[in-house]
Structure formats: structure tokens, C-alpha cells
């Protein structure tokens, strides 16, 4: 399992989400789902810890 910090930009403000990646959920899918509506813009992802 990997823990990521994913940063999005919303109305000029950065917003950081923690995301736990496992076999059922990938960080790329999470980013795709979060940005689908168009008001969040993906900024960066950072691997915090691998368990």
C-alpha cells in the first residue's frame, strides 16, 4: 500500500488530500475522478509512505 499527498488547485487555492493506494484503487483514478467536474485542477502527487 502507498500513501500519497495529492495537491489540487481550486479557485486559486491549493488543497491537499491524503490518498491510500491499494489493489482496488489507484492514485491516477482518484485524480481523474477528482478533476472530472472541472473545478479542481491537478497540481502534484507525492509519495509519502509505502507500507
Regions inferred by a protein language model and the residue ranges of each:
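A short, exposed loop/beta-hairpin motif centered on an aromatic-Gly-Thr core
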Residues: 13-25
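Acidic-residue sensor for enzyme active/binding pockets
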Residues: 5, 21, 50
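Short, surface-exposed linear segments at secondary-structure transitions and domain or protein termini
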Residues: 24-33
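Short aromatic-glycine-(Arg/Gly/Cys) micro-motifs in beta-strand/loop hairpins
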Residues: 1-15
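Short, mixed-charge low-complexity intrinsically disordered segments
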Residues: 32-51
Amino acid at each position: 500500500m502507498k500513501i500519497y499527498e495529492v495537491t489540487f488547485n481550486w479557485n486559486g487555492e491549493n488543497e491537499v488530500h491524503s490518498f491510500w493506494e491499494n489493489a482496488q484503487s489507484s492514485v491516477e483514478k482518484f485524480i481523474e475522478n477528482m478533476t472530472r467536474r472541472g473545478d479542481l485542477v491537478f497540481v502534484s502527487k507525492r509519495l509519502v509512505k509505502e507500507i
